[in-house]
Swiss-Prot record:
Pfam families: GatC
GO cellular component term of the entry, any: mitochondrion
Chief location bin: mitochondrion
Protein origin, superkingdom: Eukaryota
Similarity comment: family membership: Belongs to the GatC family.
A GO biological process held by the record: glutaminyl-tRNAGln biosynthesis via transamidation
Protein's organism: Ixodes scapularis
Swiss-Prot/TrEMBL catalytic activity: L-glutamyl-tRNA(Gln) + L-glutamine + ATP + H2O = L-glutaminyl-tRNA(Gln) + L-glutamate + ADP + phosphate + H(+)
Function: Allows the formation of correctly charged Gln-tRNA(Gln) through the transamidation of misacylated Glu-tRNA(Gln) in the mitochondria. The reaction takes place in the presence of glutamine and ATP through an activated gamma-phospho-Glu-tRNA(Gln).
GO molecular function: ATP binding; glutaminyl-tRNA synthase (glutamine-hydrolyzing) activity
Assembly mode: Subunit of the heterotrimeric GatCAB amidotransferase (AdT) complex, composed of A, B and C subunits.
Signal peptide residues on this chain, from the entry's feature table: none
Entry protein name: Glutamyl-tRNA(Gln) amidotransferase subunit C, mitochondrial
Transit peptide: 1-17
Length: 144
């Protein structure tokens, strides 16, 4: 009888707490004036710099508007008041994880190079990721 009542109370408590989300879906800003509401317009030089650094093509207006929305979202996060909020921790922070021993398997270079799409002088050839993109006309910003 006692065990049944304890399990009922436990399930009732868990059910009542699980219906409310612990982490809010959107950032909570205590000072709405500092939220930075409004639209953010990026200059063409900024878009060119971000395109060159990230190697992402912002060639149309939709891509630039997505970038502006991301910057706006990040500016809202920067204005969130975190005073008095303790940093999050993980239960695995101080735990030594026991991993299995690595067993090295010997295989020939011919077997390994069978996985490569392009081979040059017995080396894998990967597509270059650091070639700068050519600048576009105005990136859909409307201003020149």
């Amino acid at each position: 009888m006692f065990r049944r009542s304890v399990s009922f109370v436990r399930s009732h408590v868990l059910r009542s707490f699980s219906s409310q989300p612990v982490v809010p879906v959107t950032p909570i800003v205590k000072n709405p004036a500092s939220q930075g509401a409004g639209t953010i317009k990026l200059e063409q030089s900024t878009v060119e710099l971000l395109e060159r650094l990230s190697l992402v093509d912002f060639s149309n207006a939709e891509a630039v508007s997505r970038l502006e929305e991301a910057v706006k979202f990040a500016s809202v996060i920067m204005n969130v008041d975190t005073t008095g909020v303790r940093p999050m921790v993980t239960p695995l922070e101080d735990t030594v994880l026991r991993l299995r021993d690595d067993v090295a398997e010997k295989c020939s270079s011919e077997d390994v190079l069978k996985n490569a799409a392009v081979i040059e002088e017995d080396y894998f050839v990967a597509p270059p990721g650091n070639i700068p993109l050519e600048p576009k006309a105005n990136y859909g910003l409307g201003n020149s």
